[in-house]
Amino acid sequence: MFKKIEEVSKLSGVSKRTLQYYDDEGILPVKRSKNNYRLYDDETMERLWEILWYKEMGLDLKEIKLILEGMKQEIVIEEKVNKINYTIRVLEEQKKVIEYIQRYSIPVKSEENNQTYKDQIKQIRKEQGV
C-alpha cells in the first residue's frame, strides 16, 4: 500500500520539503501517481528508516548516497570514525590552550628573538606541554 508525502512526513517526523529534497537528489526515489503525487511504498519507507539512522550517525547526504549506491557501509563508517577521532584530537588540543590561558593568561611575546609570532607560540606550547 502506498503512502502520500503528508502521511510519510507525519509518520517519520521528516518535513515534506526534506522528503521532496531526498527524492530530487535521488537518495529516496519514489513512485509517482497519475497526478504526479509522490507515493511511498514499504521499500521506500525502509530506505527512509536507514537514511534517518545514517543521519543520526552524523553522515552527510553525500556519504549516505555512497552507501545506498552500493559502497560498503563499513568503509564509509570507518572514514567517519576517523574524521571524528581527528576532530576530537584537535578539540582536545584547543582545550589545553584555553585552559592554559585561563590559568596563566596569554604569554608575553618576545621581540628580542628572531622568531615569528607563530613560531613563538609553537615554542611556548612545546615548553609548557600545551
Predicted regions and their residues:
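Basic helix-turn-helix/winged-helix DNA-binding cores
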Residues: 1-66
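Short, charged amphipathic alpha-helical surface segments
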Residues: 52, 65-124
